[in-house]
Regions:
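C-terminal amphipathic alpha-helical interaction region
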Residues: 653-756
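Alpha-helical metal-binding/catalytic segments enriched in His/Glu/Asp
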Residues: 210, 332, 348-402, 407, ...
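Second-shell loop/turn segments in exported
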Residues: 40-48, 62-71, 140-145, 179-186, ...
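Extracellular/luminal Protease-associated
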Residues: 71, 128-266, 274, 361, ...
Length: 756
């Protein structure tokens, strides 16, 4: 959505001036003396990133297709390695061998009631010079679909989510033995074949609906930024949320040369039914051939056809075969050793692989990472020395499902548990507002960074612009909180990019940052995501790339140099209380929904509204969900609030003398702070998916990338497993109690330190 800067400025008059920070206030975790020195170094750093360099980095890295195992993927890794070394960082390439299937046979044809053979191809466009590199481009496909040869009636299932199948049940339609066709979006793509298989389907097609990223939203490429009739979204359909991301053959351990591997048949995360992505140009003849009930109004897209559900009379034949080969992924790892606490690590990452040329995804994020590294290298030559060790990582294999970062995390898990303080992630970057997500112990900290970054278009701070934009779009209740709460609430993280192993598996405090939201785009995972598209329809002057370098570079420096890691737990406690309220409302809403539906069944409402020309099946009567005992969770959250306030008070009284505390004292205190996020994990993991250890954040089993907060409890309620939800309440409460105890011990340590 485009925003009006004039409207935002009107709202600025309503915000207290102290919301925008003050340069003379000491930074969190710094004494006044070290704070001023830090601000001076940060100002020098923010003057370094250059849009001209970002443009050249993107042009170079996106010049050819660079998917996993391709020659240019390796070439880019070696080029990045050379740049890190040129700028004074210690650097090496770490290689893992992972399963990465590529297609041998792709056939989709309609055999009844008429004949149609899908093109399954994105043609080159004359205006777009890299779109013609066909011999190097991966075909349009979904990685980790199994081989398959199926012929079956077609059924349209909207977005292919569980609630869509509930609607099909009401229509009396089964997908058992059918091939389903689903729209992209509203969930991670791998959820669609997962749910289809659970309902008995034998195959799955996923198409890009023009209502979502095509001509309904703007002109199509090359006249505009949106997906044209032949554009296809490649992507992984690995069932990572129910199992784990990374190499399917080495779950839980690094995919090193000598790792013990499963067979492909033993790999649990490979999709259960064949899956193929198609364009809306190929989807239209298939959808037009469907009959049966008209699709519900909210299912209908913008193709010039009546949207029927089926089944049939359209019958399709889908045949897929893949090369099931191991391919190398090349992670580029660079290091700046810490001068005081080298065994505490600040890790910064972005991936470098793409499905094709990948200018937007991922190079628009990778280029700013490189410019950050160049900037820090420049500061090193001027005498700056980070207190902690900084690690820069250019991950490979993110697109197939976080292969490079996950294998690195699993290989180095014990080291990371001991040393990793914070992980900071970026991915694709565009023009617009700053998006902040991550661990809520870092919420106050990252708000402070955002206050110090200038938005390139409005010249107000990135924080102020985001804050005013939130007010412009908020409800009356939300506007009240936005105006009263000092910090913007940051997003909780699920998955979908390289922070997953750090946060969800190891419990390392994490941030995920990026700009965007102002420009439409419809080239995601297609051959048209390239330098031509980006420099015509996105951040073509690279000023938001520079802003990302400035934002994340400042974040890295501020974390690396602080005497005390700038964790703040009052915002985290507030967020936990908010999650508990959401869970209680979720349960209450479900109870009321079931109670009302049961009453309508008893009253005969469904019988009275039955239309024999449009027959539907009445829902089944259900037991009303039981009450859950949230008291342990509420008590634990209250304890966390008290501990957080105690720690904040203790830190405030000792902040002036932090630079005079001994290294051993500060190291012991920081070790507790690093451990705080780990306390929110459980070694047994989440129910039925033990790789995911974090009890507050996880990707949803039926949402994929989308986060489920307090996932064991929330998904227990959503999936009607109420006994399990009660058990998870107790587990989460114990984790919060353990974190509270740790925070109390950190507060006590501060209280007992001598005054400067």
């Amino acid at each position: 959505m485009r925003r009006c800067a004039a409207l935002l400025l009107v709202y600025a008059l309503t915000i207290p001036s102290n919301f925008f920070g003050a340069d003379d206030a000491p930074l969190s975790g710094y004494s006044p003396r070290s704070s001023q020195s830090e601000r001076d170094w940060e100002a020098k750093f923010r003057a370094i990133p250059d849009p001209a360099n970002l443009r050249e980095y993107m042009k170079r890295m996106s010049a050819r297709p660079h998917h996993v195992g391709s020659p240019y993927d390796k070439d880019n890794a070696e080029w990045i390695l050379a740049r890190f070394k040129e700028w004074g960082l210690e650097a090496h390439i770490e290689t893992f061998n992972v399963l990465f299937p590529t297609p041998k046979v792709r056939l989709l044809e309609m055999i009844e009631p008429t004949k149609y053979t899908a093109k399954l191809e994105e043609p080159a466009i004359a205006a777009d010079p890299t779109s013609n590199q066909k011999s190097e481009q991966l075909p349009t496909y979904n990685a980790y679909s199994p081989d398959g040869d199926v012929t079956a009636p077609l059924v349209f299932v909207n977005y292919g989510l569980p609630e869509d199948y509930e609607k099909l049940d009401r229509l009396g339609i089964s997908v058992k033995g059918a091939i389903v066709i689903a729209k992209y979006y509203h969930s991670w793509r791998g959820v669609k074949p997962k749910v289809a298989a659970e309902h008995g389907a034998v195959g799955c097609l996923i198409y890009s609906e023009p209502q979502d990223d095509g001509y309904t939203r703007d002109e199509v490429f090359p006249q505009g930024p949106m997906r044209n009739p032949n554009g296809v979204q490649r992507g992984s359909v690995m069932d990572f949320a129910s199992n784990s991301p990374g190499d399917p053959l080495t779950p839980g351990v690094g995919a090193t040369a000598d790792a013990k591997r499963l067979s492909v048949k033993e790999a649990k995360s490979i999709s259960k039914i064949p899956v193929l992505p198609i364009s809306y140009g190929d989807a239209q003849p298939l959808l037009a051939a469907l009959k049966g009930p008209m699709a519900p109004n909210e299912w209908r897209g913008s193709l010039p056809i009546p949207y029927h559900v089926g089944p049939g009379p359209a019958k399709v034949h889908l045949k897929l075969e893949f090369n099931w080969d191991l391919k190398p992924v090349n992670d580029v790892i660079a290091k700046i050793p810490g001068s005081v606490e080298p065994d505490e690590w600040i890790i910064r990452g972005n991936h470098h692989d793409a499905w094709v040329n990948g200018a937007e995804d991922p190079v628009s994020g990778q280029a700013p990472l490189l410019e950050e590294a160049r900037g820090l290298g420049t500061l090193l030559k001027q005498g700056w020395k980070p207190r902690r060790t900084i690690i820069y990582a250019a991950w490979d294999g993110e697109e197939p499902m976080l292969l490079g970062s996950t294998e690195w995390v699993e290989t180095h898990a014990e080291e990371l548990k001991q040393h990793a303080a914070v992980y900071i992630n970026t991915d694709g970057n565009d023009r617009g507002l700053l998006s902040m997500g991550g661990s809520h112990s870092l919420e106050h900290f990252i708000n402070g960074v955002a206050r110090d970054i200038e938005d390139p278009e409005t010249k107000m701070s990135a924080w102020q612009r985001e804050h005013l934009s939130d007010i412009a779009q908020a409800s009356a209740d939300d506007r009240k909180e936005l105006r009263e709460r000092p910090d913007i609430r940051i997003n909780a993280l699920g998955s979908g990019t390289d922070f997953t192993g750090f946060l969800d598996h190891l419990g390392i405090a994490t941030l995920d940052l990026g700009y965007g939201g102002e420009d439409e785009q419809g080239i995601y995972h297609s051959i048209y995501d390239d330098f031509y598209w980006y420099t015509h329809f996105s951040d073509y002057d690279f000023v938001y790339g520079r802003a990302l370098s400035q934002t994340v570079g400042t974040t890295v420096m501020r974390l690396a140099d602080a005497e005390v890691l700038p964790f703040q737990f009052t915002n985290q406690a507030d967020t936990v209380h908010k999650y508990i309220g959401e869970l209680q409302k979720l349960l209450k809403d479900k109870q009321e929904e079931v109670r009302e539906r049961n009453q309508q069944l008893q009253e005969g409402v469904f019988k009275a509204t039955f239309d024999p020309r449009r027959p539907t099946v009445a829902p089944a009567r259900e037991e009303i969900p039981p009450h859950l005992d949230f008291a342990p969770l509420e008590n634990a959250a209250d304890a966390l609030s008290r501990s957080a306030e105690r720690y904040q008070k203790a830190l405030g009284t000792k902040q002036a003398g932090l630079d005079q505390q001994g290294v051993e004292t500060l190291h012991a205190l920081n070790a507790k702070l690093i451990e705080s996020e780990r306390k929110l994990t459980n070694e047994d993991g989440l129910p039925r998916r033990t790789w995911y250890k974090h009890l507050l954040y996880a990707p949803g089993v039926y949402s994929g990338y989308g986060v489920k907060t307090v996932p064991g409890v929330r998904e227990g309620i959503e999936q009607k497993n109420y006994a399990e939800a009660n058990q998870e309440i107790v587990r989460v409460a114990k984790a919060l109690e353990a974190e509270s105890t740790l925070i109390d011990s950190a507060a006590q340590m501060l209280e007992q330190t001598s005054h400067p």
